[in-house]
Amino acid sequence: METMSRRAVLAGLVAAAAAPALAQAKTNPRRIDVHHHSEPPFLLERTRAALLASSPYASDVVAWTPERSLDQMEQWGIETAIISNPTNWSALGADGNALCRRTNEYAARLRADHKGRFGFFGSVPLPDTDAALSEAAYALDRLKADGIGLVTSYGDKWPGDPLFDPLFAELNRRKTVVFIHPTAPGCCSRLIPGIPAPTVEFMFDVTRCITSMLFRGVFTRYPDIRFIFTHDGAALPMLADRITRNASVVRSAGFGSQEAAMRVLKKLHYDITTSTSRPALTALKTLVPVSQMLFGSDFPFLKPAETVPGLDKFGFSAAELNAINRGNAEKLFPPLRA
């Protein structure tokens, strides 16, 4: 009996020691963050002034280091962050294309130095279509990028413009994941004095971008591209009925009915970055199934603390949260599967 008692005590001690690890394994969501940014030092030399002038969060952005990302990832259960760099390369002058290449190579080294913690969307120097095609091939073939990152507009052109067709045709052939990040269009970056462009214009440019692509038939002509749009699709969920109704009567859009146009929007992917208020998530969940939602943080512009609490409190089931936090991204990025 004494021997059995000792065994029982030892077993109890082992179980007690393992309990915290088991609890962590059950609660750690192992998130995949599809909306995460890097700011390489060599690029900040060129963009620091513009960032400080345009973003209320620029002080955190210019202080970015990989270690800061990893610290936030540890705090918020993010296993892998897929980084992107939504820079206007053409605004950087003659060496913009070279800086784009250096940024892609930097991202590839970051992924190699921290295996399993980072992926990246390759940048391309649009609106130079030939250079963008060349850089996309380099990023995907040589650097093994997880996808390609674009922005919602380039000057006065949105991705529904024919300018983008050669790039989309190639990315469709490759069945690429394309992440499209908001920016302020040339017309509207200072539309309302005193209000930073990210406050409103970024959100409406996401909506303009999707609308331009829908009306031009981009999603139907390039069905093998998996598109990710940000911030719950911005104003799209609230305007989807109006947009698809109008798209259905514009002959060039190629839809025979509003329902056909709506089905296209429901197949797109949307990150829930910093858009986890009850009204925002309710609107998105009304538009698309949970299978189309992805986790994102927007670090270092914002922190996971701006997204996670609202997501956790919304009322998703455990299975739905697992899909948003990780499972849906695993389907888009098979190398990240556990």
Question: Where are the regions a protein language model picked out?
Answer:
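Active-site environment of divalent metal-dependent phosphoester hydrolases
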Residues: E39-F42, N88-A91, P127-D128, D156, ...
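Active-site gating/metal-coordination segments in enzymes
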Residues: E79-I210, R216
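H/E-rich (His + Asp/Glu) clusters that bind or coordinate divalent metals
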Residues: C188, I195-L214, R221, R226-A338
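Active-site neighborhood of phospho(di)ester-bond hydrolases with catalytic His/Asp-centered motifs
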Residues: I32-V34, S84, F121-G122, G149, ...
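Histidine-centered divalent metal-coordination motifs
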Residues: H35-H37, H181, H231
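Mid-to-C-terminal alpha-helical segments outside catalytic/metal-binding sites
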Residues: E2-R30, V34, P40-T80, Y106-A112, ...
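A short secondary-structure junction motif
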Residues: E45, D95-G96, D241-R245
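Short, basic, glycine/proline-bearing loop/turn elements
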Residues: L51-Y57, T152-S153, M262, K266-H269
